[in-house]
């Protein structure tokens, strides 16, 4: 297994927390170009690292992004996502606004919502069985 999927250590934790994040532009417009995506990937990677996380995979279509992330358990997922959206929006507005402004209305780039799911580890049924089968003390 690759190093990126191994256990990570924090100051007081050992963790393996992976998430699949999907971000969409406002109104799910088809706005992304290859040039934008080539610039967004290292920006997202750097932003994750600044917050103690890790960008493991980056993929996209014209109207949405897929990111596989490792986020430390001490970090708020909503704050983490907010930082990713904020820095990327700032970049896109600064460098590509002329290309996208006609496809969006108003001043916002990202939809206010996002989709995130935890991933990796054992299937839920296996974890459930493991927890159920713990030996409780008889006292």
Segment roles from a protein language model:
Residues 1-139:
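Basic nucleic-acid-binding interfaces
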């Amino acid at each position: 297994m690759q190093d990126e999927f191994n256990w990570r250590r924090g100051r007081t934790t050992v963790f393996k927390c992976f998430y699949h994040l999907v971000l969409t532009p406002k109104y799910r417009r088809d706005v992304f170009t290859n040039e934008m995506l080539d610039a967004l990937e290292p920006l997202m990677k750097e932003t994750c690292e600044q917050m103690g996380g890790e960008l493991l995979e980056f993929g996209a279509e014209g109207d949405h992004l897929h990111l596989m992330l490792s986020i430390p358990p001490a970090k708020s997922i909503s704050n983490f996502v907010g930082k990713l959206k904020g820095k990327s929006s700032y970049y896109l507005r600064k460098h590509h606004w002329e290309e996208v402004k006609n496809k969006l209305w108003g001043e916002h780039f990202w939809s206010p919502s996002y989709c995130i799911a935890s991933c990796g580890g054992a299937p839920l049924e296996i974890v459930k069985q493991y927890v159920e089968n713990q030996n409780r003390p008889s006292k």
